[in-house]
Every structure is written in structure tokens, then in C-alpha cells.
């Protein structure tokens, strides 16, 4: 029970940390883009990946983290996740450039529906429960309602926003699939993704001339801007890890819903700090419907978790009883059966007759008598043991039937029932 509570607390803590880091990163990146006109987004992505790769490699060499060394087999296991992670972060940065922060959040609120659909197709783990399905549909309707209040963004921003949602959903589903297919944890996944993506991002940063023209940016003279830039790099590393960890522990849909919950604070900060979206009645109604869908999802997942824990308790209880079928507490102590001596007298008489008939061969008769006596004692002990075992098994079968309502996966009566001869 304590281990179950600890697992739930860890899952909730990781989800909250993911929401905090993700919301903070969105706000800080929007500050860089809107207030300081910082447009070198590929450089931000490259430095985030390289910082994570160098930090994890240093910690691995110092023996502070248990991560296997990078190799081709390890890279092959997370190749799809690494490609989608790089593409998702690029599309997110470009959509933040072309969309207002609240409108970007509205796009991200469609993530649970897309994640659920891709998860059903890829993971093939069955349809979601009615509560989860209702929560996802309500959340998506709220996002569409809120999006109808702002259609003034850049068309490229809308296109990249839609692509970012699709790629992000596929990225989360692929993380969940990798967690089931491989034995590596989220820290190993982040290490492999960072090491694999860093060379490609370095090439892209030079190809886009971000790494060349970024150093002539006048904002480097502002300490606040430099602090925000460094914070974006560090928080980006933390957010990538919490994304992986939350998906490993919980699920892809839960990770996408964390973004829905944290978006309330993001929308509030976006409207107050940037003033690029007026809080229209349609937009506010969409946010309210979105929040209602998030609450329904939390309640549905709580009920599912409690139902699953009850089922696991019943399973463990049944397995515990199945492991010790002969360890039931008997209401009284069974007495041992008395030794049967009916077969010993004829055998001893037979041995005496042999000794009279073979008077001249006393030594041979004595040896034969000893062997017959040993054989009779072994047969006697074997029959005694079989009798005690059959009586005890019969009593235990009757006692299990009398005990009442606990049913086992095996039917011991059917196992020991004698089949009729043909």
C-alpha cells in the first residue's frame, strides 16, 4: 500500500513539474520574441540540446547517473523519438513566433484529442473509457470556441501550430511505446535524444545563419535579456526530461492534459503581459469549457486508477492464496495414522518356512529374511505416507469448500478427481 501511494505521489509530482516548466518556458520564450525581438530560435534549440547532452555525459562519466554509454544500438532504439523531438521543438518555436501566446495555448489544447487518436492507432491498447473520451471532446470543443475569437494571427503561425500539435502528439505516443518496448528509463531517453539531435541542430543553426548573426544582436548588453535567455536554455532541458518522465510514469494523454491545466495561468499571463489578444466573451467561454474538460479528465482518471488498484489488490490476494495451497490454518491438529502391521506376519511366517525347508542353508535363509524384512518395512512406510497425504489432501479440499466465498484460479477437486475407466 505504501509503495502504491509513493508511485501515485511521484506521478502527480512529475506532472506538476512538467506543467510548471512548460508554462514558464512558453512565457519566457514569448518575452524574448515579443519584447526583445529575438528571432534566433534555432540557436535556442541547439544550445538546449547541447547543454543537455554535455551535462548528462559529464554526470555519466562521473558515475552520478546510471546511464549506458551512447552507441548505435541505443540510438536505434530511440531514433524515432529523437527525430520527432527535434521537429516538435522547431515547430513549437516557429508557432510561438507567428501566434499570440493565448492562441498558441488554444492550439495546444487540441493535443489530447490528437494524442488519444494516434495512441489508439499505434499502441492498440483499446478504446479509452467514456469519461476520458468525454473530457477530451469537451476540451477540444472549448479550444475551437476560444480559437474562434482570434483569427488575426500570421497564417504561417497557424500552419506551424497545427503541425506542432500533430508532431507533439506523435512524439508523446512514441515515447510511451518506447517505454514499453525498451528497458531504459526517461533519463537514458533524454541522453540519447540530446546526443543524437545535437549534431543535426548545430548544422541547422549554421545553415540558418542564426549562429553567425546572433552575436551581433544588441540585446546581449541587457542583463535581463541574457538572464531570460539562459533561463530558457535551462528550463528547456528540465521540461524535456519532465515530458519524458511524465509520459513514462503516467501516459501520453495525461501528459497532454497537463498542458491543458497549466494553460490557464499561461493565458492569464499572456493577456496581461503582452496585450496581443483582447479577452472577448467567446474566448473566455472557450477557456471555461476547456477547464471543465480538464476537471472531467482528472475525475475520470482518478476513478480509473482507483478501480485498477482494487483489481490489482484482488489479483495479488488470489495469487498469494494460490502460492500456498497447503498452508491453510486447520481448525485442529491432525493425528498420525497408526502403522499397519497386517502384512508383516505373513512375510515373517514365510521366512520361517523357508528356513525349515532349507535347513542346510541357514546363512542364505538369514540373508533372504533380512531382505524381505527391509522390503516389507519400505512398503509399509510408503503406504503409511500415501495414506496420510491422501487424507490431508481430502480434508483440505473439503475445508476450502466450507470456507466460503474465495474462489481460486485452479479447481483442486477437478485435479484430484479420478477419471472413470472406459
From Swiss-Prot:
GO function terms (MF aspect): protein-macromolecule adaptor activity; UDP-glucose transmembrane transporter activity
Subcellular location: Cytoplasmic vesicle, Secretory vesicle, Synaptic vesicle membrane; Early endosome membrane; Endoplasmic reticulum membrane
Any GO CC annotation of this UniProt entry: early endosome membrane
Regulation: Inhibited by proton uncouplers that directly abolish the proton electrochemical gradient.
Reaction(s) the record says it catalyses: UDP-alpha-D-glucose(in) = UDP-alpha-D-glucose(out)
Keywords: Cytoplasmic vesicle, Endoplasmic reticulum, Endosome, Membrane, Sugar transport, Synapse, Transmembrane, Transmembrane helix, Transport
Biased composition (Polar residues): 355-364
Region (Disordered): 339-365
UniProt GO BP: energy homeostasis; platelet dense granule organization; positive regulation of autophagy; positive regulation of protein exit from endoplasmic reticulum; protein exit from endoplasmic reticulum; UDP-glucose transmembrane transport
Gene knockout outcome: Mice lacking Slc35d3 display decreased concentrations of serotonin in platelet-dense granules and altered hemostasis. Mice also show a loss of dopaminergic neurons and exhibit metabolic syndrome and lowered energy expenditure.
Organ and tissue specificity: Expressed in brain. Expressed in subsets of dopaminergic neurons. Expressed in maturing megakaryocytes.
UniProt xrefs under PANTHER family: SOLUTE CARRIER FAMILY 35
Protein name in the entry: Solute carrier family 35 member D3
Gene: Slc35d3
Amino acid at each position: 500500500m505504501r509503495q502504491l501511494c509513493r508511485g501515485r505521489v511521484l506521478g502527480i509530482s512529475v506532472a506538476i513539474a512538467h506543467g510548471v516548466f512548460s508554462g514558464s518556458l512558453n512565457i519566457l520564450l514569448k518575452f524574448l520574441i515579443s519584447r526583445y525581438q529575438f528571432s534566433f530560435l534555432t540557436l535556442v534549440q541547439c544550445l538546449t540540446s547541447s547543454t543537455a547532452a554535455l551535462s548528462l555525459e559529464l554526470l555519466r562519466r562521473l558515475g552520478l547517473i546510471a546511464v549506458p554509454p551512447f552507441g548505435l544500438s541505443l540510438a536505434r532504439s530511440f531514433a524515432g523519438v529523437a527525430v520527432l523531438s527535434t521537429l516538435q521543438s522547431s515547430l513549437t518555436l516557429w508557432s510561438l513566433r507567428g501566434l499570440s501566446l493565448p492562441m498558441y495555448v488554444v492550439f495546444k489544447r487540441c493535443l489530447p484529442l490528437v494524442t488519444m487518436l494516434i495512441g489508439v492507432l499505434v499502441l492498440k491498447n483499446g478504446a479509452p473509457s467514456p469519461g476520458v473520451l468525454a473530457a477530451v471532446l469537451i476540451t477540444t470543443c472549448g479550444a475551437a470556441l476560444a480559437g474562434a475569437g482570434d483569427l488575426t494571427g500570421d497564417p504561417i503561425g497557424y500552419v506551424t501550430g497545427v503541425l506542432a500539435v500533430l508532431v507533439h502528439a506523435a512524439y508523446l505516443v512514441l515515447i510511451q511505446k518506447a517505454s514499453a518496448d525498451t528497458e531504459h528509463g526517461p533519463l537514458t531517453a533524454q541522453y540519447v535524444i540530446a546526443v543524437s539531435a545535437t549534431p543535426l541542430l548545430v548544422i541547422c543553426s549554421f545553415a540558418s545563419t542564426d549562429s553567425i548573426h546572433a552575436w551581433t544582436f544588441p540585446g546581449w548588453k541587457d542583463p535581463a535579456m541574457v538572464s531570460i535567455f539562459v533561463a530558457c536554455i535551462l528550463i528547456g532541458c528540465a521540461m524535456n526530461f519532465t515530458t519524458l518522465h511524465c509520459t513514462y510514469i503516467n501516459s501520453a494523454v495525461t501528459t497532454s492534459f497537463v498542458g491543458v491545466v497549466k494553460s490557464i495561468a499561461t493565458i492569464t499571463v499572456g493577456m496581461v503581459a503582452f496585450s496581443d489578444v483582447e479577452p472577448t466573451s467567446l474566448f473566455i467561454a472557450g477557456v471555461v469549457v476547456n477547464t471543465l474538460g480538464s476537471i472531467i479528465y482528472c475525475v475520470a482518471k482518478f476513478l480509473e486508477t482507483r478501480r485498477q488498484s482494487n483489481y490489482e489488490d484482488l489479483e495479488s490476494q488470489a495469487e498469494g492464496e494460490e502460492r500456498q495451497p497447503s498452508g491453510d490454518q486447520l481448525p485442529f491438529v491432525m493425528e498420525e495414522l497408526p502403522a499397519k502391521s497386517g502384512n508383516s506376519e505373513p512375510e515373517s511366517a514365510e521366512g520361517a518356512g523357508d528356513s525349515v525347508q532349507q535347513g542346510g542353508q541357514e546363512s542364505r535363509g538369514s540373508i533372504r529374511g533380512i531382505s524381505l524384512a527391509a522390503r516389507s518395512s519400505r512398503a509399509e512406510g510408503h503406504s503409511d505416507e500415501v495414506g496420510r497425504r491422501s487424507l490431508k489432501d481430502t480434508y483440505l479440499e473439503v475445508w476450502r469448500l466450507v470456507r466460503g466465498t474465495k474462489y481460486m484460479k485452479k479447481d483442486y477437486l477437478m485435479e484430484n478427481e479420478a477419471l472413470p475407466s472406459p
